[in-house]
Swiss-Prot record:
Domain of life: Archaea
Name under which the protein is recorded: Uncharacterized ABC transporter ATP-binding protein MJ1662
Organism of this sequence: Methanocaldococcus jannaschii (strain ATCC 43067 / DSM 2661 / JAL-1 / JCM 10045 / NBRC 100440) (Methanococcus jannaschii)
Binding-site list for ATP 2: G292, P293, S294, G295, V296, G297, K298, T299
Domain ABC transporter: 4-244, 255-547
GO molecular function per UniProt: ATP binding; ATP hydrolysis activity
Length: 555
């Protein structure tokens, strides 16, 4: 039985065709995958199938309907955590109440509770969360929250007994263990409910594990439709070969982490992190990767090394400076550090040149000299100035939040550290990132997805940092673009001697780029050494069957 019919579907944004005469069908009980590079039109297609985006030409029919698709589809989006801060089962019951009564999400009356609870437990079984029914949603892990959201979304399909599940890049940012659980849940939902599932992803391993059939979208057109392996081979044809880097690792440790411990405790939530006695070195010129399951403390360790947080115990020496001690030495050190966070954003209407000059000036000698004079004039201690200066390296939302708590705005940073540019010579960095000088006059809104990633890298590299920290900023890139990024990073390391420390869940990326890797698990450092061996141990501990099957395909 055909459940989804798409014929000559075209969607335009101005003169740009996001989708161009797209046609395909999907059968009941089929898991249909859609693959393509970033910007190929995958998410646009999913939004049209959901009924949340109009189209210009063509026909779309789902379960015999040509409109009101929201009534017969469920959608699961990447990084969407809208949940009630109540027990898990309440989140499902509220959704069921809204569906059955065409009302707001409320809890039913006491006499109705048992009937709602029975259905809610069956839905929780589908997503593997029945054992968590009484836990509060806000203390679930990221992967568990993803599955709870999926449970809420499929409630309508469960109630109606039919529907189509739409998945847009599910679990892209999840660790292998969380990803495995979500993939198994998707299979379970298809098997138990017998519904059609349409999934977009740029990750070949997800399509290999889940899909019965695969469509390749390229520049808004269907380039290929058929066997999963054949379509993936076509998709990956354009991947460049890996750059052969000549390592230049020095004997001295540019970062020393000694007996570092860090604990987080949440009221009503209990202990969320308890890293204990972590010690390791990073040699100058080395590319070191940190790997481990979600919530183990990878980002925390990176933030500690970058001086954005302080350890509860232990010491961290970065380029000869104790980064746990606030003061002018630490401020000077920050000039030699660059950091890219998991979610980076660029202001749409700024030119690349302005962004680069601004960043260069903010970390320049004159800005720091001005801060020293201004601090003396205002009677500010070096500790306060340092605490403010470190905010230039945190994500924008965190910076604004911390300043608001102090009753300040971002103006205070720029008054202390005015971005004065003495000389602007970006050519070397641009060339290493394969960006022409014409990029400088372009606004962010005019850039392609790949260009935005490289400009974000250039912002951190324009100051020629000795150390570059990367906290999973490339987790949602397609494998073709990710190979390009790996090559650029190896070139940067080779040409400028930049020490790179990165956090990633992508084992292929880690194996390709790293000199050494460390594995965090069970609140401690459990393995350190050869990236291939560390990644194999990570996969073993994660019980990630989809990755084991992927390795078999490659071998």
């Amino acid at each position: 039985m055909i459940t989804v019919k798409v014929k000559n579907l075209t969607k335009k944004y101005g003169d740009f065709k996001a989708l161009d005469k797209v046609s395909f069908e999907a059968k009941k009980g089929e898991i249909l995958g859609i693959v393509g590079k970033s910007g190929a039109g995958k998410s646009t297609l999913i939004r049209i199938l959901r009924g949340s985006l109009d189209y210009d030409e063509g026909e779309v029919e789902i379960l015999g309907r040509k409109d009101n698709f929201k009534e017969i589809t469920a959608i699961h989006l990447q990084r969407n955590f809208a949940l009630w801060a109540e027990p898990v089962i309440n989140n499902i019951i509220r959704k069921l109440y809204a569906i059955r009564n065409n009302a707001d999400e409320q809890l039913p009356l006491e006499e109705e509770w048992e009937e709602y609870e029975k259905t809610a437990i069956e839905i929780l079984k589908l997503v593997g969360l029945e054992h968590k029914k009484d836990a509060f949603a806000n203390i679930l892990s990221g992967g568990e929250k993803q599955r709870l959201i999926l449970g809420r979304q499929i409630a309508k399909i469960y109630e109606k007994g039919e529907g189509v599940l739409l998945l847009d890049e599910p679990a892209t940012m999840a660790c292998p263990a969380s990803k495995q659980k979500l993939l198994d849940v998707i299979k379970n939902i298809r098997d138990k409910l017998g519904i059609t599932v349409i999934i977009t992803s740029h990750l070949p391993e997800i399509h290999r594990y889940l899909c019965d059939r695969l469509i390749l979208l390229e520049n808004g057109k269907v380039k290929m439709d058929g066997d999963v392996e054949e379509v993936l081979n076509e998709f990956l044809k354009k991947m460049k070969p890996p750059y052969k880097r000549t390592p230049n690792i020095k004997d001295n440790a540019i970062i020393q982490v000694r007996n570092v411990s860090k604990r987080y405790y949440v009221v009503h939530g209990g202990e969320t992190l308890n890293l204990r006695n972590v010690s390791f070195d990073v040699k100058e010129g080395e590319i070191l990767s940190i790997i481990g399951p979600s919530g183990v403390g990878k980002t925390v360790i990176m933030r500690l090394m970058a001086g954005l947080e302080l350890p509860d115990e232990g010491k961290i020496i970065v380029d000869g400076i104790d980064i746990t001690n606030y003061g002018w030495e630490r401020i000077e050190l920050r000039k030699r550090i660059g950091i890219m966070h998991q979610e980076f954003s660029l202001p749409y209407y700024q030119t690349v040149e302005n962004l680069l000059k601004y960043r260069l000036g903010l970390k320049g000698e004159k800005a720091i000299a001005h801060a020293k004079a201004k601090a003396e004039e205002l009677g500010l201690s070096p500790k306060i100035v340092d605490a403010l200066y470190q905010l230039i390296d945190v994500p924008e939302s965190e910076r604004i939040s911390k300043l608001q708590k102090m009753g300040l705005t971002e103006d205070i940073i720029y008054k202390l550290f005015p971005p004065v540019v003495e000389s602007f010579e970006p050519e070397e960095i641009l060339e290493a990132l394969d960006l022409g000088k014409d990029i400088l006059k372009k606004k962010v809104i005019e850039l392609s997805g790949g260009q935005k990633v490289r400009v974000a890298m250039a912002l951190q590299l324009i100051t020629k940092p000795k150390i570059l920290f990367l906290d999973e900023p490339f987790g949602d890139l397609d494998p073709i673009t990710l190979r390009d990024v790996a090559n650029y990073l190896k070139i940067i390391n080779e040409r400028f001697g930049t020490t790179i420390v990165l956090v990633s869940h992508c084992v292929e990326f880690i194996k390709e780029i790293s000199d050494r890797a460390i594995l965090l698990d069970e609140n401690r450092l459990v393995m350190e050494g050869n990236p291939e061996e560390v990644c194999e141990e990570f996969i073993r501990r994660s019980n990630a069957r989809f990755m084991k099957e992927e390795l078999k395909c490659k071998n």
